[in-house]
């Protein structure tokens, strides 16, 4: 890799570190090519990405970025899993680590907050952005349906009373 390619890689990594909601650092020593492709596919399906980069270049790219706290984790054979959704990359990494003993989560960063392996696991258990939006939308819709039910209740009560009176009159 010549100097221009290294500078380009540092720029790309810098953009990734700035735009990612979460970055997870893991060791991947011993994974086969097929296993790495599986990890990449899972990350892509979840809206994230996986990147293997030279630790030295990644540390340079981290300088001045919000997630610079992960620089200490970049030792040995490391892989970066990242996504704009703060939960997606953590879920992918955590699920893959449960299935494959060779994939070991070292930690990560969520914005300026450094995460250890337990922190990444905690983030992975959080609901995704879409799930949170659906929950909030459901909560916002509930009062409207309650109001509609309360408004409609007197009319249905009157209808049932009239029905009862009609049944008694017919009998």
Curated annotation (Swiss-Prot):
Keywords: Ribonucleoprotein, Ribosomal protein, RNA-binding, rRNA-binding. GO terms for biological process: translation. It holds the Pfam family Ribosomal_L10. One of its GO terms (cellular component) is large ribosomal subunit. GO terms for molecular function: large ribosomal subunit rRNA binding; structural constituent of ribosome. Belongs to the universal ribosomal protein uL10 family. Forms part of the ribosomal stalk, playing a central role in the interaction of the ribosome with GTP-bound translation factors. NCBIfam families: PRK00099.1-1. This is Large ribosomal subunit protein uL10. It comes from Roseobacter denitrificans (strain ATCC 33942 / OCh 114) (Erythrobacter sp. (strain OCh 114)). The gene is rplJ.
């Amino acid at each position: 890799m010549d100097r221009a390619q290294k500078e380009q890689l540092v720029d790309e990594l810098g953009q990734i570190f700035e735009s990612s909601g979460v970055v997870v650092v893991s060791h991947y020593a011993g994974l086969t090519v097929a296993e790495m492709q599986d990890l990449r596919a899972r990350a892509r399906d979840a809206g994230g990405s996986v990147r293997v980069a030279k630790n030295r270049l990644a540390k340079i790219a981290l300088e001045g970025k919000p997630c610079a706290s992960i620089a200490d984790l970049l030792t040995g054979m490391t892989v970066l899993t990242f996504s704009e959704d703060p939960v997606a990359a953590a879920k992918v990494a955590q699920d893959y680590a449960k299935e494959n003993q060779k994939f070991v989560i070292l930690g990560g960063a969520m914005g300026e907050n450094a995460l250890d392996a337990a922190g990444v696991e905690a983030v992975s258990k959080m609901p995704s952005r879409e799930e949170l939006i659906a929950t909030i939308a459901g909560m916002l819709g509930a009062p409207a349906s309650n109001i509609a039910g309360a408004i409609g209740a007197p009319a249905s009560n009157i209808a049932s009373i009239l029905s009862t009176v009609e049944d008694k009159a017919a009998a």
